[in-house]
Amino acid sequence: MESLTLQPIELISGEVNLPGSKSVSNRALLLAALASGTTRLTNLLDSDDIRHMLNALTKLGVNYRLSADKTTCEVEGLGQAFHTTQPLELFLGNAGTAMRPLAAALCLGQGDYVLTGEPRMKERPIGHLVDALRQASAQIEYLEQENFPPLRIQGTGLQAGTVTIDGSISSQFLTAFLMSAPLAQGKVTIKIVGELVSKPYIDITLHIMEQFGVQVINHDYQEFVIPAGQSYVSPGQFLVEGDASSASYFLAAAAIKGGEVKVTGIGKNSIQGDIQFADALEKMGAQIEWGDDYVIARRGELNAVDLDFNHIPDAAMTIATTALFAKGTTAIRNVYNWRVKETDRLAAMATELRKVGATVEEGEDFIVITPPTKLIHAAIDTYDDHRMAMCFSLVALSDTPVTINDPKCTSKTFPDYFDKFAQLSR
């Protein structure tokens, strides 16, 4: 297996422009495909997850033109749900942002579909979404294990009315249903059961739907009403924000070993909840400065925090490795959904933090981290999880090297991450 050893870094300083957000890119591509009119998407992320969505859209009869650098895409909207005459199999890798929204969207029109992916995708739950879609008369069957992909979907349309959806495992189930609801056969009301996790990701969904001309009435995240008679209309141009989760590594690096790092492509008005990572970093002692389209982080004396990270679970992973440089014991709480991501991130994070010398307590939905007096050089396993690889790059900000196994797994969201990280390192 390929590995990459990062030597100790003395100083982190400079400017980095973020690749487009994965969450925004795949949502916008799907809505552009369903909308009437042509949409020109700029700053699109070029990564595995986006490629899986684009490949699926091609098979579904959507025409688009992709620039040579793959960051600008002109999508010719269908102006309706997908209609296919031949049975189709769509392979979606490990892209939850493609699997969940497409599973809902393919129920709307006509066609016979199988949705499948990599082995890890078959371990990632989708039952709560399927249950909700079935309430709206969707025809879906599990081909292997109950509640998990692969799925067979017969497109027959989604009925109007009220459905309940469990929000406690992943917000992607609600996102998927919300994006399909305007093309259902009438007014749709979605009632949430349990505590809705990752609410900021729902805000992203609602914001993008609004840009494509659809209004959703949000009753305090407990009930969502999608009035009848709406359809998606291209906004013409659509700028994909920089990926706020990807910003977290550079901001944390500056907090630990700045200098200062300026991250461009997101700012104080970002629609992504993961910009709240900077607030958590500030609580630890970093200096943070906000602009309209940038964030600057500077080094500070870092202290441990004990916080609920339910709203920003992806960026919270970066706090786990930042905790290695903080005084005291850090607790990251209410992150059960780490267990159903690209890998079981609670187990993986605990295992790898212990390798570098940390004392770790792992609970069902929390992790508590006490740093060692000196970090140990270890080979970090990444579990085919892009965020594990990027989080553990921060270990090199000590006086100890770190070896990252399978560094190319960052291609899921940030193919040139290690190049960008090296450019800022002194």
From Swiss-Prot:
The active site is at residue 314. It comes from the Bacteria. Phosphoenolpyruvate binds at residues 22, 96, 124, 172, 345, 387, 412. GO terms for biological process: amino acid biosynthetic process; aromatic amino acid family biosynthetic process; chorismate biosynthetic process. GO terms for molecular function: 3-phosphoshikimate 1-carboxyvinyltransferase activity. It is an enzyme of class 2 (transferase). One of its GO terms (cellular component) is cytoplasm. InterPro entries: Enolpyruvate_Tfrase_dom, Enolpyruvate_Tfrase_sf, EPSP_synthase, EPSP_synthase_CS, RNA3'P_cycl/enolpyr_Trfase_a/b. SUPFAM superfamilies: EPT/RTPC-like. Keywords: Amino-acid biosynthesis, Aromatic amino acid biosynthesis, Cytoplasm, Transferase. Pathway: Metabolic intermediate biosynthesis; chorismate biosynthesis; chorismate from D-erythrose 4-phosphate and phosphoenolpyruvate: step 6/7. It catalyses: 3-phosphoshikimate + phosphoenolpyruvate = 5-O-(1-carboxyvinyl)-3-phosphoshikimate + phosphate. The keyword DNA repair does not apply. It holds the Pfam family EPSP_synthase. Its EC number is 2.5.1.19. It is found in: Cytoplasm. 3-phosphoshikimate binds at residues 22-23, 27, 170-172, 198, 314, 337, 341. Belongs to the EPSP synthase family. Monomer. Catalyzes the transfer of the enolpyruvyl moiety of phosphoenolpyruvate (PEP) to the 5-hydroxyl of shikimate-3-phosphate (S3P) to produce enolpyruvyl shikimate-3-phosphate and inorganic phosphate. This is 3-phosphoshikimate 1-carboxyvinyltransferase. It comes from Vibrio cholerae serotype O1 (strain ATCC 39541 / Classical Ogawa 395 / O395). The lineage of its organism: Bacteria, Pseudomonadati, Pseudomonadota, Gammaproteobacteria, Vibrionales. The gene is aroA.
